[in-house]
């Protein structure tokens, strides 16, 4: 059976991993889909992080 074109990916906050002095413990993660033919590189989006209490860059993780 062939693989589908759309993948479910996870986006993780980059500042939560590196900053121990934040508002609350934990790491912000979002799930979304991407088209593997149109977007072959790792996805980076600016999303709100409730742990940092601000908008930060969220990068795609495996």
From Swiss-Prot:
Molecular function (Gene Ontology), one example: structural constituent of ribosome
GO cellular component, one term: cytoplasm
Primary gene name: rpmG
GO terms under biological process: translation
Record's keyword annotation contains Cytoplasm: no
Keywords of the record: Ribonucleoprotein, Ribosomal protein
Lineage: Bacteria, Bacillati, Cyanobacteriota, Cyanophyceae, Gomontiellales
Record HAMAP family: Ribosomal_bL33
Protein family (similarity comment): Belongs to the bacterial ribosomal protein bL33 family.
Superkingdom field: Bacteria
UniProt keyword Ligase present: no
Protein name in the entry: Large ribosomal subunit protein bL33
